[in-house]
Amino acid sequence: MMTDQKMEIRNLDFEIRAEQNEQHGNYITGRPIVYDARTDIGPWDEIIDRGALDNTDLKDVRFLINHNIDMIPLARSRNNNANSTMQMSVDEGGMEIRVDLDVENNADAKSLYSAVSRGDISGMSFMFSVDGESWEDVDTEHPTRHVTSIRRVLEVSAVTFPAYSQTSIQVRGLADALDSAKASLESERAKLREIERKKKKIRIMTEVL
């Protein structure tokens, strides 16, 4: 399931809801990706820009609990076709999903539906790789990273602790991604320093003349 792409994970406390009706059975809905929402990653703030999902690979996306790749997926979206047990829609606000849960035959699905209904689980998370980014306020101690394009969404999870990044898969997969983002930030800061150096050189030459 893991790829050679540098995958990142974002855990967010956006609402996830449990619903039930005679036509669709038991399902949960939620919005794992929200455009223009500022998230404190630690070394920087991060914003997923509007339109970042326009060209994203959503061909095969699983739905899990706490990114546990050792468990059977509770749902899956294949090319987002009508027969998929997870439906994904991208709109002006980001991404919304609808997950049909087989509560009769899958104990984990039944437990998740109950936990969401009770409010014990309220957050969603997604694993993704970045295709485009930009930075602002790179000369400050807490810059802002804009994710302008998401290359692929690999999976979406209902998460127990939406405000933290503590699962084992994050420890394995997030380190390289964070290192890459930090390298990108340092590159932007180096460019800024070079611009300032050239400006200073021009000022000195002007004063001499």
Q: Can you name each region flagged by the protein language model?
A:
Residues 189-209:
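Enriched but not universal
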Residues 1-183:
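Signature of dsDNA virion morphogenesis modules
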